[in-house]
Each structure stands twice: as C-alpha cells, then as structure tokens.
C-alpha cells in the first residue's frame, strides 16, 4: 500500500475519523510506540484532523440561523453566513 493510500481518509465519516484520531492520540501519549511508527501514525493523525476540519466546515455552511421579527418571534431562517 502506498503512503498516500495509507493517509487517504476521504471516505471516513466524521465519527469514524474522530474515533481513530482519539486512538492515535492515546497511543502517542502512552509513549510506547517506536519512533518510525510514531511518525507514521502522527502523519495519519494529521490527515484525520484535516478531514474532520473539512467535514465540520461543510456542516457549518449548511447550518441556518433563525431570523426573528421586531417582536422577537421566529420569522424564518437564513444561511449562517448571511448569504
């Protein structure tokens, strides 16, 4: 398996990526991993972190905020970023 294939996490769900990232952090914090393996799993962790950030950003763009009228009653929704 190529290095880029080992780092490919693009088809992971957010939950799967976070779970694997937590596992990697725990392994690195224990300190019982050889240097070469530590570097490899750190790189995988970076790929997982970036993937999670991408998924979170996409989710934020889909969230809408509730628009209130002058009386403070819900009037509708608008995109979070105001566009």
Curated annotation (Swiss-Prot):
GO terms for molecular function: exodeoxyribonuclease VII activity. It catalyses: Exonucleolytic cleavage in either 5'- to 3'- or 3'- to 5'-direction to yield nucleoside 5'-phosphates. Its EC number is 3.1.11.6. GO terms for cellular component: cytosol; exodeoxyribonuclease VII complex. GO terms for biological process: DNA catabolic process. It comes from the Bacteria. It is found in: Cytoplasm. It is an enzyme of class 3 (hydrolase). The keyword Cytoplasm applies. Keywords: Cytoplasm, Exonuclease, Hydrolase, Nuclease. Heterooligomer composed of large and small subunits. Belongs to the XseB family. Bidirectionally degrades single-stranded DNA into large acid-insoluble oligonucleotides, which are then degraded further into small acid-soluble oligonucleotides. This is Exodeoxyribonuclease 7 small subunit. It comes from Rhizobium rhizogenes (strain K84 / ATCC BAA-868) (Agrobacterium radiobacter).
């Amino acid at each position: 398996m190529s290095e880029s294939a080992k780092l490919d996490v693009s088809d992971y769900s957010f939950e799967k990526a976070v779970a694997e990232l937590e596992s990697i952090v725990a392994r690195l914090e224990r300190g019982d991993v050889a240097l070469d393996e530590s570097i490899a799993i750190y790189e995988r962790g970076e790929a997982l972190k970036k993937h999670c950030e991408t998924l979170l950003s996409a989710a934020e763009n889909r969230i809408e905020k509730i628009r209130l009228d002058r009386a403070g009653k819900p009037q509708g929704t608008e995109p979070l970023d105001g566009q």
